[in-house]
Every structure is written in structure tokens, then in C-alpha cells.
């Protein structure tokens, strides 16, 4: 269409772009565009998730400003390696001339120059020789060699400018969470691998000289601007010799300053690493943070991040042994620093928080005996299968209190799912939250982006605020989710309908946290100086860590409760690979529930399974179920036997399994089991992804379940293989998921004949 020309107060010709009555932008004659509204990242996710987007325009396009008095000043929920944007990480990689592995060059299909291809081929041959007798073979050997073959990242970009635009675009995409639809924790774990190349980068031994003319040819203006500033920093004596990590923290502060954020608490697992890494980080913090505060005005504090479960990508490194024991010993060491203000249990919420009660007890004791102002934070209420984790978190802390000990400073991250807040249990929870002065942290974008929330009407923040509960906003990592703090606050305002009074309440909590933190820092700084007593930081903390490890070894108790059995031992006779010559049909309904919830099989649902068994060819398809032998999954096994069918039925089971589930699998007519890399049962959806959705076409029939089956469905939608997904909308817990995937998943009711539709859509199983 045509935009009418207007004259503004300065007698300039301008063009006003409006859509749906909302002013989008002012366009000036010289081509400058002044944006007045935006589509937040969270809305873009919801739009890409469905083929039938139906949010109204006022909840899609939002004014891009907030009243100054209501603008949040803190980010109290974020993670160290999730904070920086892709552009900052790429610029840091160029400045630092990091090693960029061949594995990622291949994985992202990046383009090298002919000279670079020849050089890296020579290097790879040398590396291959080193692993000749490693015992590895096939894909594992290839991966090992490619992981240890590198190109200088600066060389890759500056001496390959003809491909720079293409390569930077691909690398950018790899450094933030999936944008075209909701992601799941599998995507998060993969993303961390790509970000670690930059966040934990290793500088090349031999650096190249950068021609100034080539700097001007960086095809992305934002990256060029960042890189030029980073090179100017080298002229500053205070910044000339800082480490990559210190550089990273400096840029975190600079990015926060742009957003008017002046206080943040960052969770970092490096602060829990024994024998040097944690102490090294503290030493670096004590050098760089005073400078950062002086330059930016941003105060950065840290929380020791303790993994509730290890990340899948690094599980083999730390799963063995009582890893939380070592983490807690290190925590008690680094917590001497005034920059370390608390702890944070992080990671995917797929286990009952009471599993962590021994570790929580030890933290509560530490607060009582050593540091009464130390914060205990727990990620809880992110998973609808564990709705009691918020109340259980509080209970674990209360039951750990020593006689006469007041409730510590407690914050709960997410708080999205709890008991119904209008029920007696929910009202009891609200009273406890208020009485114990507990702060809830909300991150709406990460909730939606990580498939924990599909229906925005279910978000409880407004109810908490109305009940007088202290609430704050966090980001969960701006760079990770491609957002900023303003984007988050706009989403709260326009999608969750928080008003100015709500924001005033949240700002008041922020002010309280910052005020307490400032006093805490002042006191703790004096205590730290006394503790050092003339020693340097490394010397003093190394001595203390050694003492803490000795004391820790005297405590033989496991810090995480686990009564399950090793699946490989109890089901060894059942372990086998999934077939590759047939189409897998996944039946979900029984293994994917919250604890204590049982799936009831309806007569209509049973009839659908009978029809499916009758019409599908056993030579062309097989069934895959979960580990519980309950509900529709158990029903397909029994019907296969009763109807004298000969379908192969396999189960994907967790790495650790209960005695009951193990016995049930052995008693049923299960042809084989595939053992997941995940120890917790709610994480087995990841193995459905690795074993099926990323490798082959499949059919998914989701009858019932909570968050785990929602993740299973999302994995099927996101996978490289083509999955036909059928979702039972009679199940209340699946209804919202079916709606959000409108056009990508086919909803069905158990009293309808969906089987003919399945056969029609999937002729290869006939």
C-alpha cells in the first residue's frame, strides 16, 4: 500500500506506518526508521509453532517502551554461558583468535577457502595418527579426530571474506535457541555445546596479524562495531591482559548497561569445580568486577550453580561418584568471596526435589553456622509433572532448619506449576511463601521457548502478585533466547496483562534485594579481608578447599537420594537395538505422567488400538513404548498377545530403573529395551529423539501424559525425520499442546475413527 506523507513538529516530511491501529514506525525522508513497536521473541515462537496463529494483533505487535519508573533494574535469574548474544561471542572469538573445531565446520556446513581446506586436511591427518590406537572406531573415532582438529577462528573469517557473510549467518543461528517453534531441553543441551566453543574458548598458540582493511570488510555491522571496541580495549592498561572469561563478564555488564540493568546475579557451575577452576574464577572476579562497576555502574554477583542432574552432554564426566559432595565442599570455599552471594540448584526439572534433600540440609547448615545472609535458590515449578516441587522445596528447607534457626533467604526459579492456587493446598502454599518471605523469579520467554508453557492464560504470576507474594523477573540468559530484559517486560505487560501497580510491586522487591545485597557485600568484604590475613586469594582458598574436602570425606552420606537400579544390570537380557527396516509407531500413554498419576484406558481407546493392530502390517512397522507398563502402553502389549499378532514391541527405558518397573518389563511380552542416556525417567523423551525422530520417519500416537509427553511430541515435530503426530484431545493435559501445534499435529478423540486417517497418511505401514 501507500503511506501518506505527513509533516511533524520540526517541519520534516515523515511517513507513519500503522497496523491494526498500532503505530509501528516513523519513516524519515533520508531513509532512517524509528521503530515504535515490535513483535517480542516469545510471540514469534508462538507464531511459528502453529499453522493457524490466532492471538489478536494487540498481543502480537507491542509498543516498545515502558514507563521509566516501572522499568526493571535487575536480572536475578540468569546463567553465565547463556548471557551474551551471538554477535558478542563471535566478536570475542575473533579478538581472542580461538580454536574453532573441524567438527563444527562440518556440522554447520561452513565454507573454507581452498588454502584453509588444504591446511586443515594436513592437520587432521596428524591428529588422526594420534588416535590410531585409541580403540575408537566409526563415528566415535571421526568425532574425536574432528574435535581435536582446529582452525584459527580469526583466520577462518578474515582470510575467507568471500564466505564470511554465509559463515557468520550459520554460526549466529547455532548460538541461540531454536526460533521456528518451541524447543526442548535436548535443544538446550546441544546449544550449550556450540556456545562453549566461544564461552570457554581456547586461544590459538600462533596468532595471525589482522589487516585493518579486512576489519572494515566484516560483513555484519554489529559484529564489526563490537570487534573494533574490543581491539580498543587492548589499549586500556586495565584490560590489556584480561582473560577471555573476564572479557566475557565485561561485555555482559556492557550489554546490561544498554538495557538499564544495574544489578544481576549469575549462576555459574565453574564455581563448584574442585581442584583449581573455582578458585581461579574467584581470583579473576576480584580483579575485573571493581573495574566493571566503575565503567558501567553494573553490579554483578554470582551464585554457585549445583546441577540437580548432570547435563546429558557432559554426563559421562561427572555422573559417577558423589559429585554433589565435591560441589558443596568447593561452594563452602568460594562463598568466602563477597562476590559469591548464594547457591542455585539448576538443570532440567525431571526429578523430585526431595532427592536433593541431603544437599539442601548441608546448605541450610552452612547458612546457620557460617553465613546467615547466603541465598539458597532452587529451580522448581518448571515442569507440570512435578507440581509439588515448589511446596516440597520449601518443606525440605524447613525440615533442615536447626533449632532456633530462622528461614534463610530463599528464592525459587520459575514457580510456574504448583498445586491449584485456589485449592486448600494452593492457599497453604501462598501462606508459606508469604510467611517465609520467599521470592519467586519468572522467565516467561524461556518457559514458552523450552516447551514448558503453551497456553499463556495458565501463567500464575498475576495470582501471586495479587496474593502479595514477592516476584521478580529474570531472563534465563538473554543471549540464549535472543531476548533482552525490555522484551521480557513487554511480554509481561502485553501477554500476561500486568499493570503499573504490578510492576511497582516487582520493582519494590528488586529494590529490597539490591539494598540487602549492598549491605551484605560491605560486611562480607571486611570479613574476606580478615580471612585472607595477608595471603593472596589463590593461596588462602586452596588451603580452605583442601580442609573442606577432608571434612567432606568424613561424611559418607550421598548428597542425592537414588534408590533405583542400574538398568544395564537388571535388564541385560532384554537390551537390543531398535529395528531399522520398519517404521516405528510410538504409543505414549502410561509412562509419561507426573508421579502418582495413572492413565486410565477407555473402552474407546482400547478399540482404537485393536483397529491399529488389525490394519497395520507387522513386517512393515513395530511399536515403541516407555518403561512403565501402564495405560495404553501396557494395553498394546496385551492386545498384541491376545489377538495373536506378531508385532515387535520395544521399550525405551531410563538408565536407572525402579525394581517394580524392571519386574514389569521382564514379565511382559517386550521384545527388547533400549537404554536411555538419561537416569531420570522423565528425561527418556530425549532418547526417543536420538534413536527415532532424528534418524527416521515415524508415527506418534499420544494418548495421555504431562510434560514428558509434551516434550516427546515437540521432539517429534522438531526432528530431522518426518513424524506424523496424532494427539488425543480428550486428555486435558494434552489439549493445549494439540492446540499449539495446530497444523503440525492432528488432534483426535477416542470415540472417532482416527485409525483410517493414520493408515491414509502412512501407507508405508500397510
PLM regions: where:
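Metal-cofactor-binding active-site regions of metalloenzymes
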Residues: 18-20, 31-34, 38-555
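A charged, well-structured terminal subsegment
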Residues: 751-765
Amino acid at each position: 500500500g501507500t503511506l501518506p506523507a505527513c509533516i511533524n513538529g520540526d517541519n520534516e516530511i515523515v511517513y507513519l506506518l500503522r497496523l491494526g491501529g498500532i503505530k509501528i514506525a516513523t519513516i524519515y525522508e533520508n531513509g532512517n526508521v524509528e521503530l515504535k513497536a515490535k513483535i517480542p521473541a516469545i510471540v514469534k515462537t508462538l507464531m511459528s509453532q502453529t499453522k493457524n496463529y490466532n492471538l489478536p494483533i494487540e498481543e502480537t505487535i507491542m509498543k516498545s517502551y515502558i514507563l521509566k519508573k516501572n522499568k526493571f533494574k535487575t536480572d536475578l535469574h540468569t546463567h553465565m554461558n547463556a548471557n551474551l548474544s551471538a554477535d558478542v561471542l563471535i566478536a570475542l572469538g575473533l579478538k581472542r583468535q580461538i580454536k574453532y573445531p573441524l567438527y563444527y565446520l562440518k556440522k554447520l556446513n561452513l565454507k573454507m577457502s581452498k588454502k584453509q581446506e588444504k591446511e586443515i586436511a594436513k592437520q587432521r591427518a596428524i591428529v588422526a595418527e594420534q588416535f590410531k590406537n585409541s580403540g575408537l572406531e566409526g563415528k566415535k573415532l571421526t568425532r574425536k579426530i574432528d574435535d581435536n582438529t582446529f582452525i584459527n577462528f580469526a583466520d577462518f573469517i578474515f582470510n575467507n571474506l568471500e564466505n564470511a557473510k554465509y559463515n557468520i549467518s550459520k554460526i549466529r543461528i547455532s548460538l541461540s535457541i531454536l526460533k521456528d517453534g518451541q524447543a526442548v531441553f535436548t535443544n538446550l543441551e546441544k546449544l550449550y555445546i556450540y556456545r562453549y566453543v566461544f564461552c570457554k574458548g581456547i586461544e590459538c598458540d600462533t596468532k595471525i596479524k589482522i589487516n585493518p582493511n579486512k576489519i572494515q570488510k566484516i560483513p555484519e555491522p554489529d559484529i564489526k562495531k563490537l570487534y573494533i571496541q574490543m581491539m580498543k580495549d587492548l589499549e586500556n592498561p586495565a584490560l590489556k591482559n584480561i582473560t577471555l572469561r573476564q572479557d566475557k563478564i565485561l561485555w555482559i555488564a556492557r550489554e546490561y548497561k544498554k538495557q538499564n540493568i544495574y544489578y544481576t546475579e549469575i549462576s555459574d557451575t565453574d564455581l563448584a569445580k574442585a581442584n583449581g577452576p573455582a578458585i581461579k574464577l574467584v581470583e579473576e572476579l576480584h580483579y575485573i568486577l571493581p573495574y566493571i562497576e566503575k565503567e558501567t555502574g553494573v553490579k554483578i554477583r554470582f551464585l554457585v550453580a549445583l546441577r540437580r542432574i548432570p547435563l546429558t552432554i557432559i554426563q559421562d564426566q561427572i555422573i559417577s561418584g558423589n559429585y554433589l559432595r565435591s560441589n558443596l565442599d568447593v561452594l563452602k570455599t568460594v562463598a568466602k568471596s563477597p562476590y559469591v552471594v548464594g547457591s542455585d540448584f539448576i538443570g532440567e526439572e525431571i526429578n523430585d526435589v526431595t532427592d536433593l534433600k541431603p544437599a539442601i540440609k548441608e546448605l541450610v547448615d552452612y547458612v546457620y553456622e557460617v553465613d546467615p545472609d547466603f541465598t539458597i535458590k532452587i529451580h522448581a515449578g518448571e515442569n507440570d509433572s512435578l507440581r509439588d516441587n515448589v511446596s516440597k522445596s520449601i518443606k525440605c528447607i524447613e525440615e533442615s532448619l536447626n533449632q532456633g534457626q530462622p528461614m534463610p533467604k530463599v528464592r525459587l526459579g520459575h514457580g510456574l506449576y504448583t498445586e491449584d492456587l485456589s485449592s486448600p493446598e494452593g492457599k497453604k502454599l501462598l501462606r508459606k511463601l508469604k510467611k517465609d518471605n520467599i521470592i519467586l523469579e519468572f522467565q516467561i520467554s524461556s518457559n514458552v521457548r523450552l516447551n514448558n508453557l503453551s497456553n499463556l492464560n495458565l501463567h500464575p504470576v498475576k495470582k501471586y502478585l495479587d496474593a502479595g507474594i514477592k516476584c521478580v523477573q529474570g531472563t534465563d540468559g538473554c543471549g540464549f533466547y535472543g531476548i533482552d530484559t525490555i522484551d521480557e517486560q513487554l511480554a509481561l505487560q502485553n501477554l500476561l496483562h500486568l499493570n503499573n501497580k504490578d510492576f511497582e510491586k516487582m520493582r519494590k522487591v528488586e529494590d529490597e534485594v539490591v539494598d540487602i545485597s549492598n549491605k551484605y557485600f560491605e560486611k562480607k568484604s571486611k570479613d574476606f579481608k580478615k580471612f585472607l590475613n595477608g595471603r593472596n586469594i589463590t593461596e588462602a582458598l586452596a588451603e580452605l578447599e583442601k580442609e573442606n574436602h577432608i571434612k567432606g570425606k568424613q561424611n559418607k552420606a550421598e548428597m542425592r537420594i537414588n534408590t533405583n537400579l542400574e538398568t544395564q544390570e537388571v535388564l541385560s537380557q532384554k537390551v537390543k537395538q531398535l529395528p531399522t527396516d520398519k517404521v516405528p509407531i510410538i504409543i505414549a500413554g502410561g509412562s509419561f505422567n507426573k508421579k502418582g498419576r495413572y492413565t486410565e484406558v477407555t473402552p474407546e481407546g482400547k478399540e482404537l488400538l485393536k483397529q491399529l493392530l488389525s490394519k497395520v502390517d507387522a513386517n512393515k512397522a513395530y511399536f515403541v513404548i516407555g518403561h512403565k507398563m501402564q495405560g495404553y502402553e501396557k494395553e498394546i502389549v496385551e492386545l498384541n498377545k491376545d489377538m495373536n499378532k506378531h508385532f515387535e514391541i520395544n521399550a525405551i527405558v531410563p538408565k536407572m530403573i525402579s525394581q517394580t518397573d524392571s519386574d514389569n518389563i521382564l514379565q511382559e511380552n517386550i521384545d527388547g529395551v533400549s537404554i536411555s542416556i538419561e537416569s531420570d525417567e522423565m528425561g527418556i523423551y530425549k532418547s526417543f529423539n536420538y534413536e527415532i525422530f532424528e534418524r527416521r520417519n515415524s508415527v506418534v500416537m499420544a494418548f495421555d501424559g504431562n510434560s514428558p509427553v509434551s516434550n516427546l511430541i515437540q521432539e517429534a515435530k522438531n526432528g530431522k525425520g518426518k513424524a506424523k503426530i496424532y494427539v488425543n484431545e480428550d486428555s486435558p493435559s494434552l489439549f493445549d499442546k494439540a492446540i499449539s501445534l495446530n497444523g503440525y499435529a492432528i488432534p483426535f478423540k477416542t470415540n472417532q475413527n482416527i485409525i483410517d486417517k493414520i493408515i491414509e497418511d502412512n501407507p508405508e505401514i500397510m
